[in-house]
Amino acid sequence: MKTKNFRDMTDEELLKEIDGFKTELFNLRFQLATGQLDNPARIREVRKGIARGKTILRERELKINRA
């Protein structure tokens, strides 16, 4: 998901999205451990999504405006 999409979300929506990413990451790691993971690159994408979401939330806390 693009950063612009995160910026368009409300804080509640952003928290739900981050929670969804965390659940997905848990499932992906479980699949990796059991050898059932089809796309290992997805783990990286999900981790970056979590980081982007948390960064946007923190910027809002500090009232930092980014383009």
Curated annotation (Swiss-Prot):
This is Large ribosomal subunit protein uL29. The gene is rpmC. HAMAP family: Ribosomal_uL29 (MF_00374). It comes from the Bacteria. Keywords: Ribonucleoprotein, Ribosomal protein. Disulfide bonds: none annotated. One of its GO terms (molecular function) is structural constituent of ribosome. GO terms for biological process: translation. Belongs to the universal ribosomal protein uL29 family. It holds the Pfam family Ribosomal_L29. GO terms for cellular component: cytosolic large ribosomal subunit.
